[in-house]
C-alpha cells in the first residue's frame, strides 16, 4: 500500500517519461529520489530523461512580431492601392460623418431612399428564363451599411458615396422606358423574360444594375447615352473589382448593355485602349497560347433542349432559333481557323474536307430555316439573321477555295488557275443571300427597327460592304453587270436610306444624334462614293477583261481580294460621329476598296 502511494506520488507527468519508457510506450514511474524509474531499475537499464515534445519554441515570440510587421506592411500596400483605385474612378466623396456602401442610381419614389446596397449573393442561374419574384434579395432601407470615418483599416474596402451626374428619372418616365424595352427591344433578342408584373420599382429593388442598364440602352441621344454609359461602367468597376461581387444582376445588366450598345459604331476605343488591348493579346498569346472561344458543352445543349420543349415563355422559340443560327456560324468560323493554321505542301487536299464541311453546314442551315414556324413572332428579323449566316458560310467557302485548285461539276479536282466553279457558285450564292437579306429587311416595320440590337446593324453594314465588293470585283470570269441587274448598289442604298429616314420619325427618336441618323450618314456618304466611281469602274472592268484575256489566258482572280465578313478593316476603327473618319475611309485610293 505504501509502495503504491509512493509510486503514484512520483509518477511522471504526461510528456516527461524517460527515454526507455518512451520507446517502449510504457508508464514511467519515478523513484522517490527522482533520479531513475522503477522500470529501468528492474531491467537494469540506464534511465535518461527524454526531451519534452511540448517544448515551446523559443523563437515563437520573435516570429509573431515579424509576422505582425509583414501584415502591417501588406495592409499599408492594400490601403495605398485601393486609395489609388478610388481616386481613379473619380468618386466625389463628401466629408460627412458616415459613408454608404457603393450604390446604383435609382428612383426616388414612395418614400424609399434613393440608393440601395448590392447583395453579395453568388451567381445563381434561374431554373427558367423568367425572372420571378423569388429571385434576388429584397433591399430594405435598414440594410444600408455605414462606416465611421474613424473606423479601422478594413473600411477601405467600402467605397465612398456614389453621386450620379444625371438626375434620377421620374417614376412615370422609368415605367415608360421599361415598357419600351419590354415591348420594342427585348422581342428582337429575348434572352430574358420580363413579365408585366415586374415594374420599374421592383427592378430598382431587386435588379438595380439591370434597371440602370435598361435606362442606358433606352437613351437614344448619343450625348446623353455617353453619360449613362460612364455611370454604368463605374458601377461595373466598383461592384466587380472593388467589392468583388458576382451575382445574376450584374450578368443580366452586362448582357443588356452589350446587346444594344452603340460603342463600336462611335469609335469609343481611344489609342490607350487599343494599345492596352494589343498588349493583353500579346501577353496571352505569348504565355498562355491562343485562347479559344467558349465551347458548346453538353450542358448547354441540354439547356437548349429544355427551352425547345418548354412552353413557359412564348419568346423562347425565337431565342432558341437565334442560338442555333449562331452555333452554325461559330462552327463555320472554326473551319476557317483550321484552314488558316494548315501547314504542308498540299493546300488543295487540306481545303477539300473543309469545303465539304461547309456544304454540310449549309444544308443544316436550310433544314433549320425550314423548321421556323411561319407564325413565329419576329420571323422577319429571324430570316435576316439566317440569310446573314448563310452569307457568312458562303464567303468562308470562297476564301478557303481561293488558294485551291477549282472543282469541276462532278466535284473532282480540276486543273488550271481560272476562277473555278466552286468559287463562282459561292460568289453568286452570296449575291442571292444579299438580295434575300434586303427583301426581309424591307419587310421589317419601321417601329421595329428602333429596338434592334447591335448585331443587326453590324450585319447590315457588312452586307452592304460585301455587295460593293461583288459589284466591282475585277475578274474576267465574274459578270459585275449581272450582279447590278440582280441587286443594284445605288438603288439599294436609296431604299435603305428611305427606310431609315422613316424610322427616324418615331416618337422615341426626337433627337439629332441617335444611331439611325449616323447610319443614314454612312449610307449617304457611301452612295456618293459609289456614284462617283460607278462609270469609272465599269469602263475599267471592260478594258481589264479584254486586256487580261488577250495577254494571259491563265490570269486568275487571286489579285482581286474579297475579305471575310469578320475581317473588314474599317469596322475596327469605325466612328460614325467623326467626319474625319469618313474622309480617311472614303478618301482612300480606289484600289483599297
Swiss-Prot record:
Does Glycosyltransferase show up as a keyword for this record? Answer: no
The record ties this protein, via SUPFAM superfamilies, to:
Zn2/Cys6 DNA-binding domain
Q: Which GO terms describe its cellular component?
A: nucleus
This entry's Gene Ontology molecular function terms read:
DNA-binding transcription factor activity, RNA polymerase II-specific; transcription cis-regulatory region binding; zinc ion binding
Gene3D superfamilies hit by this protein? Zn(2)-C6 fungal-type DNA-binding domain
User: Which InterPro entries does the UniProt record give?
Assistant: prtT (IPR051089), Zn2-C6_fun-type_DNA-bd_sf (IPR036864)
Return the annotated DNA-binding positions: 18-47
- How is this UniProt entry's protein used in applied science? Azasperpyranones display potential anti-cancer activities. Azasperpyranones A, C, D, and F exhibit potent growth-inhibitory activity against the A549, HepG2, HCT-116, and HL-60 cell lines, with IC(50) values of 2.39-14.42 mm, respectively. Moreover, azasperpyranone D significantly inhibits HCT-116 xenograft tumor growth in BALB/c-nu mice. In addition, azasperpyranones A and C can bind with four kinds of therapeutic targets for cancer, eEF2K, FGFR, survivin, and TNF-a.
- Null-mutant phenotype, please? Results in the significant down-regulation of both azasperpyranone A biosynthesis clusters A and B, including the cluster-specific transcription factors ATEG_03638 and ATEG_07666.
A Gene Ontology biological process noted in the UniProt record is: positive regulation of metabolic process
Q: Where in the cell is it found?
A: Nucleus
The regions listed as transmembrane in this protein's record are: none
Q: Which UniProt keywords apply?
A: DNA-binding, Metal-binding, Nucleus, Transcription, Transcription regulation, Zinc
Q: What does this protein do?
A: Transcriptional regulator that regulates both the azasperpyranone A biosynthesis clusters A and B. Specifically up-regulates the expression of the cluster A and B specific transcription factors ATEG_03638 and ATEG_07666, which in turn activate the expression of their respective clusters.
UniProt protein name: Transcription factor ATEG_07667
Amino acid at each position: 500500500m505504501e509502495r503504491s502511494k509512493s509510486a503514484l506520488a512520483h509518477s511522471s507527468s504526461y510528456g516527461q517519461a524517460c527515454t526507455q519508457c518512451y520507446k517502449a510506450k510504457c508508464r514511467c514511474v519515478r523513484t522517490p529520489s527522482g533520479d531513475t524509474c522503477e522500470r529501468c531499475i528492474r531491467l537494469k537499464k540506464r534511465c535518461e530523461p527524454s526531451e519534452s515534445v511540448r517544448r515551446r519554441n523559443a523563437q515563437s515570440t520573435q516570429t509573431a512580431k515579424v509576422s505582425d510587421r509583414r501584415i502591417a506592411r501588406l495592409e499599408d500596400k492594400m490601403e495605398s492601392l485601393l486609395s489609388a483605385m478610388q481616386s481613379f474612378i473619380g468618386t466625389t466623396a463628401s466629408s460627412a460623418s458616415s459613408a454608404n456602401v457603393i450604390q446604383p442610381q435609382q428612383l426616388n419614389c414612395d418614400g424609399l431612399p434613393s440608393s440601395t446596397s448590392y447583395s453579395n449573393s453568388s451567381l445563381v442561374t434561374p431554373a427558367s428564363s423568367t425572372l420571378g419574384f423569388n429571385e434576388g434579395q429584397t433591399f430594405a432601407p435598414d440594410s444600408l451599411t455605414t462606416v465611421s470615418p474613424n473606423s479601422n483599416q478594413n473600411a477601405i474596402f467600402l467605397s465612398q458615396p456614389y453621386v450620379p451626374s444625371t438626375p434620377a428619372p421620374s417614376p412615370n418616365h422609368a415605367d415608360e422606358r421599361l415598357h419600351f424595352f419590354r415591348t420594342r427591344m427585348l422581342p428582337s433578342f429575348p434572352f430574358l423574360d420580363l413579365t408585366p408584373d415586374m415594374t420599374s420599382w421592383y427592378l430598382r429593388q431587386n435588379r438595380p444594375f439591370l434597371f440602370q442598364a435598361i435606362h442606358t440602352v433606352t437613351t437614344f441621344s448619343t450625348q446623353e447615352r455617353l453619360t449613362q454609359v460612364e455611370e454604368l461602367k463605374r458601377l461595373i468597376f466598383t461592384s466587380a473589382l472593388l467589392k468583388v461581387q458576382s451575382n445574376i444582376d450584374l450578368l443580366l445588366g452586362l448582357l443588356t448593355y452589350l446587346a444594344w450598345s452603340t460603342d463600336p459604331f462611335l469609335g469609343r476605343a481611344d489609342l490607350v485602349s487599343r494599345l492596352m488591348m494589343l498588349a493583353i493579346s500579346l501577353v496571352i498569346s505569348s504565355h498562355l497560347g491562343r485562347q479559344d472561344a467558349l465551347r458548346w458543352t453538353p450542358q448547354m445543349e441540354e439547356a437548349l433542349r429544355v427551352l425547345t420543349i418548354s412552353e413557359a415563355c412564348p419568346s423562347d422559340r425565337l431565342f432558341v432559333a437565334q442560338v442555333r443560327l449562331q452555333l452554325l456560324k461559330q462552327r463555320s468560323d472554326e473551319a476557317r481557323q483550321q484552314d488558316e493554321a494548315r501547314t504542308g505542301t498540299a493546300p488543295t487536299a487540306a481545303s477539300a474536307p473543309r469545303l465539304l464541311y461547309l456544304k454540310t453546314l449549309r444544308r443544316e442551315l436550310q433544314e433549320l430555316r425550314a423548321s421556323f414556324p411561319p407564325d413565329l413572332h419576329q420571323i422577319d428579323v429571324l430570316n435576316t439573321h439566317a440569310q446573314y449566316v448563310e452569307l457568312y458560310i458562303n464567303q468562308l467557302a470562297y476564301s478557303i477555295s481561293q488558294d485551291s485548285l477549282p472543282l469541276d461539276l462532278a466535284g473532282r479536282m480540276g486543273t488550271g488557275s481560272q476562277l473555278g466553279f466552286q468559287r463562282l457558285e459561292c460568289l453568286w450564292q452570296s449575291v442571292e443571300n444579299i438580295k434575300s437579306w434586303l427583301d426581309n429587311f424591307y419587310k421589317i416595320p419601321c417601329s421595329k427597327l428602333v429596338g434592334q440590337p447591335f448585331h443587326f446593324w453590324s450585319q447590315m453594314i457588312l452586307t452592304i460592304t460585301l455587295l460593293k465588293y461583288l459589284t466591282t470585283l475585277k475578274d474576267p470570269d465574274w459578270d459585275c453587270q449581272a450582279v447590278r441587274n440582280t441587286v443594284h448598289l445605288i438603288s439599294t442604298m436609296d431604299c435603305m436610306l428611305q427606310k431609315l429616314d422613316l424610322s427616324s420619325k418615331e416618337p422615341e427618336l426626337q433627337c439629332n444624334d441617335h444611331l439611325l441618323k449616323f447610319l443614314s450618314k454612312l449610307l449617304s456618304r457611301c452612295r456618293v462614293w459609289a456614284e462617283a466611281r460607278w462609270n469609272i469602274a465599269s469602263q475599267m472592268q471592260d478594258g481589264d477583261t479584254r486586256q487580261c484575256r488577250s495577254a494571259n489566258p491563265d490570269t486568275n482572280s487571286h489579285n482581286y481580294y474579297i475579305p471575310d465578313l469578320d475581317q473588314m478593316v474599317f469596322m475596327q476603327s469605325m466612328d460614325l460621329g467623326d467626319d474625319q473618319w469618313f474622309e480617311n475611309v472614303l478618301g482612300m485610293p480606289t484600289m483599297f476598296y
